[in-house]
Amino acid sequence: MTLLTDATPLVKEPHPLPLVPRPWFLPSLFAAFNVVLLVFFSGLFFAFPCRWLAQNGEWAFPVITGSLFVLTFFSLVSLNFSDPGILHQGSAEQGPLTVHVVWVNHGAFRLQWCPKCCFHRPPRTYHCPWCNICVEDFDHHCKWVNNCIGHRNFRFFMLLVLSLCLYSGAMLVTCLIFLVRTTHLPFSTDKAIAIVVAVSAAGLLVPLSLLLLIQALSVSSADRTYKGKCRHLQGYNPFDQGCASNWYLTICAPLGPKYMAEAVQLQRVVGPDWTSMPNLHPPMSPSALNPPAPTSGSLQSREGTPGAW
């Protein structure tokens, strides 16, 4: 039975872990600037070309684009402040030489020790070098919102990309319709603003559509944007449950409890009660190397049904 490792040394991490925490002010300022930029261009759009269409009886354009703006703004702000699935350290964690094993679809994964958070991280958990935290089911760090994308906020990220695509497309179509219907009128501020907004929307729509396609393919195959090149996983993905199940686990499945750090041990919050770390951790070797019973399920969330942690 081959024992798979889900992290170093067989996984090459794309960015080395920093020795010191990275500054947070400039990335946060950049994320806030993106929100202001969205509001600014939306204000120009609604104040000029969309206003002209509404004044001439075309109320469908402001209603549709207004709804898409609200959805986009909500998803952007929600993603900025969302919890990606942070796993905090616990002081009762065993040392790095202790071996933990978890089973995923009849494959045994040896959990890797995180030297920053001082605990054995589950499969697909990665220590983000920008946030200096371990994120469950890590996908990537999004600098546009200055937040990691992981198990608990991936659906908000997909909603943001989809709503931005629809909103950019709606703004582009609205501006083009406005320019076509005002060809008989002299050049004005409304036309200049419509051209600026249309060019900006078109420039945003192309990369967003490509990103949406890449993420859709990633979800369909239970893949990740961040993917270490594991020699033992070439051509095999034990987390793939099938296209329909992958989409359900990503978008619709319950997120499960949050994990919080206590003074002595890692705890799982379930209302006012909590379950101690031994009930959340996978069993230790060598007993963990025994194959699970046929009735035992696979991991939950984006990995499958409930696992050992």
Curated annotation (Swiss-Prot):
Q: Which organism is it from?
A: Homo sapiens
Annotated Pro residues bias:
280-294
The record's GO molecular-function terms, alphabetically, read: protein-cysteine S-palmitoyltransferase activity
> What are the boundaries of the region Disordered?
280-309
Q: Show the active-site residues.
A: 142
Disulfide pattern: none
**Class of this enzyme:** transferase
UniProt-listed GO biological process terms = peptidyl-L-cysteine S-palmitoylation; positive regulation of aggrephagy; protein targeting to membrane
Query: Where does the chain cross the membrane?
Result: 29-49, 59-79, 160-180, 193-213
GO CC annotations, alphabetized? endoplasmic reticulum; Golgi apparatus; Golgi membrane; perinuclear region of cytoplasm; perinucleolar compartment
Q: Which reaction does it catalyse?
A: L-cysteinyl-[protein] + hexadecanoyl-CoA = S-hexadecanoyl-L-cysteinyl-[protein] + CoA
Q: Which PANTHER family match?
A: PALMITOYLTRANSFERASE ZDHHC19, ZINC FINGER DHHC DOMAIN CONTAINING PROTEIN
Domain observations:
The DHHC domain is required for palmitoyltransferase activity.
Topological type in the membrane: Multi-pass membrane protein
Tell me what effect the entry lists for residue 142 to S.
Abolishes palmitoyltransferase activity
The protein depicted here goes by the name Palmitoyltransferase ZDHHC19
Q: What region holds the DHHC domain?
A: 112-162
Q: Does the keyword Membrane apply?
A: yes
Query: Which EC number(s) does the record attach to this protein?
Result: 2.3.1.225
What this protein is reported to do is described as: Palmitoyltransferase that mediates palmitoylation oproteins, such as RRAS and SQSTM1. Catalyzes palmitoylation of RRAS, leading to increased cell viability. Acts as a positive regulator of autophagy by mediating palmitoylation of SQSTM1, promoting affinity between SQSTM1 and ATG8 proteins and recruitment of ubiquitinated cargo proteins to autophagosomes.
